[in-house]
Amino acid sequence: MNNGFDTVYYLNFGAPSPAASVELAVQYAAAGCRHLQLDLPTQDPYLEHDIIRDRMLQSLSAFPSLGVYLDAICALHMRLAEVKLELTVYEDTLREIGFSRFFDFCAQAGIRYVAYLPQRQGADEALGAKLEAGGLHLLEAVPFHLPAGQVARAVATGRPIQLMMQSIGG
């Protein structure tokens, strides 16, 4: 970390397989990566570009049990304990895993920071509060073009801020 900033590398976890994702993370670490943001696949990757959306859906088709991803991420943490992990999780994936299991998984995988993405329809912001009550820290996302209102709101939360590219997918 330098002056409060970390370069965070993104890894679309699970594509082409959870095991291949672990090996790719090992390569990232060998090249100097010390901070990875992983995502868990979702059936409704509405914020993702077509490429990531397709990779998530293909991954879930090949490996439908979310336990496979959780186990692989825990194995990754055991292998690369020096690499800080954070996680992006959509509401439907979180609900499928369940809070108790999710909290246990995050503790085992050394994950403290989570980008929680509520579903578009009927978004349940209370789930974000529940994640925080369970000891996790939410990342505050701000679009790359830095809209002033969103930047001010993100700064006011006191949360770590994640600069997001806007999806250009269809």
Segments the model singles out, each with a brief description of its role:
Residues 1-81:
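Conserved N-terminal beta1-alpha1 strand-loop-helix module at the mouth
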Residues 1-3, 29-30, 73-81, 104-108, ...:
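Acidic (Asp/Glu)-rich catalytic clusters
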Residues 6-21, 84-98, 139-146, 167-170:
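Active-site mouth loops of central-metabolism enzymes
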Residues 18, 42-54, 61-74, 94-100, ...:
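Active-site-adjacent beta->alpha loops and helix N-cap segments on the catalytic face
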Residues 34, 112, 159:
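Receiver (REC) domain switch/active-site residues of two-component response regulators
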Residues 37, 114-115, 139-140, 162-164:
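Conserved beta-strand positions in the central sheet of alpha/beta enzyme cores
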Residues 79-119:
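Hydrophobic alpha-helical segments and helix pairs
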Residues 154-170:
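Active-site rim beta-loop-alpha module in soluble metabolic enzymes
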